[in-house]
A protein has these predicted regions:
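An acidic, low-aromatic, low-complexity terminal/linker signal
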Residues: 1-157
Length: 157
């Protein structure tokens, strides 16, 4: 593997599906804490939280992708990311691992499960920590910018 094509991704689950985002977007992983609700926002925007003096939107990622809302449980957490100079938090079911992938192994993704093209940037097979079978897990790479969360918040204001 040539290291100049390698990048790190944070993998996480939403229901039975495994997703990944580029590690360079991640600011921190926070335990779930119910956000303060906002009026007149799309239902996938769960509210806002205060992150060391900065108010950030908390997005139900499953809802934003058009699926059933995530059920809150002990491993639920929020991925705080930087998108276009703004911060946002995404509720996920569980963080699985941080893995290095070879960019050349990323396969194009068919837009069959998500109504918006471009949200799934690709698919990659990865070996996740704790996977006893030794088989790789298919991970859908999300393009968080394509979700246009910051634009939706500005429109709701």
């Amino acid at each position: 593997m040539r290291h100049n094509h390698e990048r790190k991704i944070v993998t996480f689950s939403l229901g039975s599906r495994m997703f990944g985002i580029d590690m360079s977007l991640l600011i921190e992983i926070r335990e779930w804490e119910a956000p303060t609700p906002l009026p007149r926002v799309p239902s996938h925007i769960l509210g806002v939280s205060n992150l060391r003096g900065t108010v950030i939107p908390i997005v139900g990622l499953a809802e934003r992708l058009g699926w059933e809302p995530s059920r809150i449980h002990a491993r639920s957490c929020v991925l705080v990311v930087s998108l276009g100079g703004q911060q946002a938090g995404f509720l996920v079911d569980e963080v699985a691992d941080i893995v290095a992938i070879d960019a050349e192994q990323v396969q194009p993704a068919p837009d069959v499960e998500i109504a918006e093209p471009g949200v799934i940037a690709g698919l990659v097979q990865v070996a996740l920590r704790g996977n006893q079978s030794g088989a790789g897990t298919m991970v859908s790479l999300l393009d968080l910018e394509a979700l246009n969360i910051t634009g939706q918040l500005e429109a709701a204001a």
